[in-house]
Amino acid sequence: NTFKRVDWVCQTAGEIENKIRALNPKYGAFTYLGEERIKLFSASAKKNNSSVEPGLIVINKEGSLEVGCKDSGLLEIETLQMPGKRIISSKEFVRGYKSTLSKNLKFS
């Protein structure tokens, strides 16, 4: 199970993107938001020099989630799944969980 878990501190955005693609759809890579296990089904690495701390969640100007990674890069989350829910876009997640998304919220 540990090979399916995303390690934001030790993996680059490109490595995490490849892991998510490789494990989709049968297994799904995952991360934690607090106590909740979140499955990640699609994402894309962004090639910018970000000052975003690994694991830190930010909302981009399009309203999608981006997460800081090891290489000072960002990974844009495209689709994800909360426990017991259907797969949704990160934009839907942002709209539905806006109250949960506070400053300095991190995936672990």
Model-inferred region functions:
Residues 1-6:
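Flexible, acidic loop-helix segments that line cofactor/substrate-binding pockets
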Residues 7-108:
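An anion-binding loop in the catalytic cleft
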